[in-house]
Amino acid sequence: MPQQPTKRTGGVRKQKRNVPNGVAHIQSTFNNTIVTISDVAGEVISWASAGSSGFKGAKKGTPFAAQTAAESAARRAIDQGMRQIEVMVSGPGAGRETAIRALQGAGLEITLIRDVTPIPHNGCRPPKRRRV
């Protein structure tokens, strides 16, 4: 069945689909946390970030902002029928563990947690040290 444009905006409404298991990618930097939940094929089901959850500036880097973003993404994924997820965590940010706990607390069963942070084999030169 083709998707029909909605009346008011003219955009295409997202179709509700039943996806029982998927993958949650948590990208946690020092400034923000982005949670993307996809099916096993890689099609994005839902996503949320600390910024899209209403936090601004330095507050986006906090663990509480990561928790709020993860809960928001998980709620939308559960509405699509998701039950089990594998979690891929990337980055050095403060919201890594908090986001995982929030996904579990929202009612998703976590089957695997993997750290996929890219580590260079002495690649690019890092930025200079800050002197404050």
UniProtKB/Swiss-Prot annotation:
Annotated TM spans: none
One Pfam family hit: Ribosomal_S11
A cellular component annotation (GO) from this entry: ribosome
Tagged with keyword Hydrolase: no
Protein's GO biological process: translation
Annotated keywords: Ribonucleoprotein, Ribosomal protein, RNA-binding, rRNA-binding
Described purpose of this protein according to its UniProt entry: Located on the platform of the 30S subunit, it bridges several disparate RNA helices of the 16S rRNA. Forms part of the Shine-Dalgarno cleft in the 70S ribosome.
PANTHER family in the cross-refs: 40S RIBOSOMAL PROTEIN S14/30S RIBOSOMAL PROTEIN S11
Subunit structure: Part of the 30S ribosomal subunit. Interacts with proteins S7 and S18. Binds to IF-3.
Family per similarity comment: Belongs to the universal ribosomal protein uS11 family.
HAMAP family documented for this protein: Ribosomal_uS11
Listed name of the protein: Small ribosomal subunit protein uS11
Species, as recorded: Cyanothece sp. (strain PCC 7425 / ATCC 29141)
